[in-house]
A protein has these predicted regions:
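A transmembrane-helix-recognition feature enriched in membrane-embedded lipid enzymes
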Residues: 2-60, 112-113
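Non-catalytic C-terminal accessory region of glycerolipid acyltransferases
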Residues: 3, 131-245
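Catalytic core of membrane glycerolipid acyltransferases/transacylases, capturing the structured
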Residues: 23-34, 38-41, 54, 69-126
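Hydrophobic alpha-helical segments typical of transmembrane helices
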Residues: 47, 84-87, 100, 109, ...
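Short gly/ser/thr-rich secondary-structure transition/capping motifs
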Residues: 54-62, 129-130, 189-192
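Generic preference for hydrophobic
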Residues: 61, 75, 98, 207-209
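Glycine-rich helix-loop-beta junction characteristic of Rossmann-like nucleotide cofactor-binding loops
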Residues: 63-68
Length: 245
């Protein structure tokens, strides 16, 4: 069984890379100019959907209410699987970008995006972190949604989450845009964070997209911590309810 899990993990990752390199000319074209970002989002969605299909994954999204993705927002989610990022590309639309660790600049696939559209952050450098924060704030103010994982890294103890960092919530408050919480319910069961060693299994990925939270009420002193705690509890409650089903 362990061998089959590892074989499936290798197969899925190969499909991700294969589809990416076939589509590379389109990705290269779409990442050259800012006004092509919506087109890039559609390309990412197609890429991820096809890779999922070839990797024997299905997906089911449940939305608490209809979401207008034409308006900028900060989208935050729990992070415990390599499936999280491609899955969120399937479930959203519009003009968006990611913020992620600087190591992704060396990733054979993702470096194209982090050298152009997405924003890398070096958490070991206060100056680099500040510059990255200002960059994404400017992008959001110009109408581009931001996607990031407030845990800061992948949780290896899912369904337990790591403590949230405040960056995502500060950006949302400072830019006067809503926070959109997203809960990945079972990705860690299909492909855990240590998937390189534990492997993966096919299945249906389940996602709950919560209603947006207006950040206008969190500008007062203590509002940042209050917002972070509230979003953590919203995502965690849904995650734990599913885990204890």
């Amino acid at each position: 069984m362990k061998i089959l899990r590892k074989l499936h993990f290798v197969w899925y990752m190969f499909m991700v890379a294969l589809v990416f390199f076939i589509m590379y000319p389109l990705f290269y074209y779409a990442t050259r100019k800012r006004e092509r970002n919506v087109f890039l989002g559609e390309l990412r969605k197609f890429w991820c959907k096809l890779a999922f299909k070839l990797g024997f994954y299905g997906h089911h999204f449940e939305y608490e209410q209809p979401i207008d993705f034409s308006k900028p927002m900060v989208i935050v989610a729990n992070h415990s699987s390599y499936l999280d990022t491609p899955l969120i590309c399937v479930g959203i639309a519009g003009d968006y970008h990611f913020m992620g660790k600087v190591e992704l600049l060396k990733h054979p696939v993702l470096k194209l995006f982090f050298q152009t559209v997405d924003v890398p952050v070096d958490r070991d450098s206060k100056i680099a972190s500040y510059r990255a924060l200002k960059k994404v704030e400017q992008n959001v103010k110009e109408g581009q949604s931001l996607i990031l994982y407030p845990e800061g890294t992948m949780s290896l103890i899912a369904p337990e989450m790591l403590e949230f960092k405040s960056g995502a919530f500060k950006i949302a408050i400072d830019c006067d845009v809503p926070i959109l919480p997203v809960t990945f319910l079972n990705n860690y069961e299909l492909m855990p964070g240590n998937g390189k060693t534990a492997g993966s299994v096919p299945g249906v990925m389940k996602v709950f997209v919560h209603k947006p939270i207006d950040t206008a009420a969190y500008k007062e002193e203590g509002g940042l911590e209050k917002l972070s705690t509230e979003v953590f509890n919203i995502i965690n409650q849904k995650l734990q309810n599913y885990a204890n089903r």
